[in-house]
Amino acid sequence: MIDKNYIPKLYKSTANMTVKEWENERRNSIGGSDMAVLLGLNHFGRTKRELFYDKTGIEPIVSDEDGYKSIIFNSGHFLEEMVADIFSYRTGLEAYEIKAMFEHPHHPHIRGNIDRFYRRKGEKDPIGFLECKTTSEYNRNWTGDKIPTDYVVQISTYLSILNMDKCKISCLFIPE
C-alpha cells in the first residue's frame, strides 16, 4: 500500500552553499533529471555511464576545455530568476524560492532542488511548484504544448518528493 499522507522532508538548506558544495550534495542522491537519465529519456544525450561517473566522482576522459557545454547547460541557472519573474508577471501568481534540497521521506536517496514554488498573492501556502526552463527556439522536443519526456519524469519525481499534485512549467525560448 502506498502511503500518500506524508510531509516532504527538507533535507538541507542550500542558501549558503557554494556551487561546488551543492554539486557534491547532489552526488549523494538521485534527482529528477537523474531519473530521466536512468530511464534513458534524457534529450540532452547524457548517458547512464556519465551519470555513474558523476555520482562516483570519476572525472570524464574527454573534458569540456573551452567550457562551452558548461555555459549552455548552466544558462538555465543564470536565467532562472528572469523566467520566474516572467511567469509571475504573466499569471499574477507569486513565484518564490526556498533555497533547499528536499528529500522523499520514504526514499531518502531521492532528492530534489525545486526551482520555485508558487502561490496566490497575499496567501501563505503554495499551490504547487514551478519548474523554470530555457531552450532554443529550434529545440524539436518542444512542439506545441508537448513537454519533453525527460522534463515530465523530472516533474513527476518532484511531485512525489513534495507530495504535491500541481506543477507549472515556464519556458523561455531563446533565439539563436
How would you describe each model-predicted region?
Residues F73, Y89-I114, Y118-E176:
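Nucleic-acid nuclease catalytic cores
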Residues M1-F78:
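Charged, glycine-rich intrinsically disordered N-terminal tails and low-complexity linkers that flank
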Residues R49, A84, I155:
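Generic structural marker for isolated residues within well-ordered, non-membrane alpha-helices
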Residues L79-R90:
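Basic, amphipathic N-terminal segments that precede the first structured/catalytic domain
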